[in-house]
Amino acid sequence: MLSAAMEYLRSCWGPASSPAGRPRKGSDAAGRQDGLLWYKDAGQLVAGEFSMAVVQANNLLEDHSQVESGPLSTTDPNLQGTLVGVYDGHGGPETARYINDHLFNHLRGFASEHKCMSADVIRKAFRATEEGFFSVVSSQWSMRPQLAAVGSCCLVGVICAGNLYIANLGDSRAVLGRLVKGTGEVLAMQLSAEHNASFEEVRRELQAAHPDDPHIVVLKHNVWRVKGIIQITRSIGDVYLKKPEFNREPLHSKFRLQETFRRPLLSSEPAIVVHQLQTTDQFIIFASDGLWEHISNQEAVDLVQHNPRNGIARRLVKAAMQQAAKKREMRYSDLKKIDRGVRRHFHDDITVVVVFFDSNAITTANWSRPSVSLRGGGVTLPANSLAPFSVPT
């Protein structure tokens, strides 16, 4: 029983750890670890390059992420492309890890069935992932009722046949860097919609969907929340706010609502944008809200534009942490010494993936490049054993 429990805990951290649970410093193919930072400074994709980094703040890393590049179909080798996923969990890592394990396989299955990539394929992959996690919660309800209160934001980008598909639940963000030919500037263009009750239009959407509930959104401690509980209005998981049969005992009382509900309080329907890539589209930044809490869209784009590609995701993480330290009137070097768990009081888990577009391969993928299947994160250090992490100069 103990060994099974240890295996479960180990799986929460992802594949970037060694079998013995020691941090992996080498192996560029699988990424590197340095203290609470995991990073992959550079890699090749079907139609471009990427840089990826994750820094942990929570005691258990709740951000999960992946980059998949190569065949997007199980039956058609000519359907090539890239998927980037950023899954910002809340209440625990289980939902984010489940998405990491299942969404891409669902997407490949539906792409094979439809013989193409489309918004409908992505929507079906989201729905199948949501339904699969519901099944897990239902099967473990009597033993692990707390799974009903775990959820995750879900940001997915798919690059295929000259199109960029952005699908989102929650408040992670995808920001495009687009060149302005006349001036040479690179401007930020946010492609993802955010689902957070802090936005008035999101609150109006909720109120319109629940006209019989005057308390669907509540201002609590100066923060707007759905039923006074959660800021996110769309997610995978959070079954206790979507199905009333899971908002009762044996779920802990702090998650249970006093009144029942007839319709799901949160949605799992992704907002999807289809963007036809242009030669002026330089790169796109995918990141959890841990980055955007500290850096604006344009600041992030400027940083990417004016620095080397190699290690740029790490550089963005550093910039966010520097701002977090500044807000608390402390030195960045001191913030790096704070261990996971306590670190969450200063900043959230942060995941960043930057994809650079190869303009020559936007419409014709470079199939000679090897397939990529990479997951971010994987820090498995014992408490109080940090080593400083480095940032490219």
From Swiss-Prot:
Disulfide bonds: none annotated. It is an enzyme of class 3 (hydrolase). SUPFAM superfamilies: PP2C-like. It is a single-pass membrane protein. It is found in: Membrane. Mn(2+) 2 binds at D88, D289, D348. Its EC number is 3.1.3.16. One of its GO terms (biological process) is regulation of intracellular signal transduction. SMART domains: PP2Cc (SM00332). Residues 49-357 form the PPM-type phosphatase domain. It holds the Pfam family PP2C. The chain crosses the membrane at residues 147-167. GO terms for cellular component: membrane. Keywords: Hydrolase, Magnesium, Manganese, Membrane, Metal-binding, Protein phosphatase, Transmembrane, Transmembrane helix. Its cofactor is Mg(2+); Mn(2+). Mn(2+) 1 binds at D88, G89. Binds 2 magnesium or manganese ions per subunit. One of its GO terms (molecular function) is protein serine/threonine phosphatase activity. It catalyses: O-phospho-L-seryl-[protein] + H2O = L-seryl-[protein] + phosphate; O-phospho-L-threonyl-[protein] + H2O = L-threonyl-[protein] + phosphate. InterPro entries: PP2C, PP2C_BS, PPM-type-like_dom_sf, PPM-type_phosphatase-like_dom. Belongs to the PP2C family. PANTHER family: PROTEIN PHOSPHATASE. This is Probable protein phosphatase 2C 72. It comes from Oryza sativa subsp. japonica.
